[in-house]
Amino acid sequence: MVSFKYLFLAASALGALAAPVEVEESSWFNETALHEFAERAGTPSSTGWNNGYYYSFWTDNGGTVNYQNGNGGSYSVQWKDTGNFVGGKGWNPGSARTINYSGSFNPSGNAYLTVYGWTTNPLVEYYIVENYGTYNPGNGGTYRGSVYSDGANYNIYTATRYNAPSIEGDKTFTQYWSVRQSKRTGGTVTTANHFNAWAQLGMSLGTHNYQIVATEGYQSSGSSSITVY
C-alpha cells in the first residue's frame, strides 16, 4: 500500500437560497453550519516536543480528526469519515532503538498502528506495522521477503512515491514496509531487526529524522490511545 499523503479533498460550496427566510430559521442555519465546520476542522497539523517526546501530527483536513497529546509518551486520536492523517509520539532523531508501547486501537475501515519514520540521504519513509484495519498496507507494495522479530513474522515490502509530500517537500522517494502477520496492540518492537533485514535486501536507510509510534487513517473512522516508552 502506498501512503495517501498526496491526496487532498476539494470542498464544494453551497449556494445561498434566493428566497427570504425568517430570522430565527436563518440564525439556526448559521449556528449549525459553523458547528459542523468546527467539527470538520478538528486538530490542525503540527510537530514539536511534548513531555520529553517528539510528536508529529499531519492531516489533509478531510473529515474530522482530533489528536491530543497526553502525559509522558501518551497520545490519543479520534477520527470520523476522515481523509488521510498520521500522528503519534516518539523521538527525533530516530535510531535502531527498542520501542515499547501499549494502548488501544479501534479502527472502522482503513487505518494502521505503526512505527513510522523518515531518513534522508537516501530519502526513505518507513513503516513497521503492528496492527491495521480492513486493508493490509502491504497489498500495494512489492514483496521482498520476511523477518521474524518480537514473536511474529513480518512481511517486507517496498513502494515508490512519485512527486509526493515528504519531509523535504514534494519529492520522489521509496517506502519500506514491515507488516506483522499476527496483529497486536502493545508490546516490544526491536527496530534493529527490521533495519538489518532491510539492509540484507538492499534496502538502505540514511540519516534518521523523526521516529514515532503512529496512528494513520484513510477514509475511515475510529479511535486510538497509545503510550510509548
From Swiss-Prot:
PANTHER family per record: ENDO-1,4-BETA-XYLANASE A-RELATED
Subcellular location: Secreted
Pathway: Glycan degradation; xylan degradation
An individual GO BP term: xylan catabolic process
Family: Belongs to the glycosyl hydrolase 11 (cellulase G) family.
SUPFAM superfamilies membership: Concanavalin A-like lectins/glucanases
Main localization of the protein described in the UniProt heading: secreted
Protein EC: 3.2.1.8
Known catalytic reactions: Endohydrolysis of (1->4)-beta-D-xylosidic linkages in xylans
GO molecular function, one term: endo-1,4-beta-xylanase activity
Pfam families, per the entry: Glyco_hydro_11 (PF00457)
Residues of this chain annotated as glycosylated in UniProt: 30, 100
InterPro entries: ConA-like_dom_sf (IPR013320), GH11/12 (IPR013319), GH11_AS_1 (IPR018208), GH11_AS_2 (IPR033119), GH11_dom (IPR033123), Glyco_hydro_11 (IPR001137)
Coiled-coil segments: none
Main function: Endo-1,4-beta-xylanase involved in the hydrolysis of xylan, a major structural heterogeneous polysaccharide found in plant biomass representing the second most abundant polysaccharide in the biosphere, after cellulose.
Keyword vocabulary terms for this entry: Carbohydrate metabolism, Glycoprotein, Glycosidase, Hydrolase, Polysaccharide degradation, Secreted, Signal, Xylan degradation
Gene responsible for this protein: xlnA
Cleaved signal peptide residues: 1-18
GH11 domain location: 41-229
Protein name in the entry: Probable endo-1,4-beta-xylanase A
GO cellular component, as recorded: extracellular region
Enzyme class at the top of the EC tree: hydrolase
UniProt keyword Transferase, yes or no: no
Active site: 125, 216
Upper taxonomic lineage: Eukaryota, Fungi, Dikarya, Ascomycota, Pezizomycotina
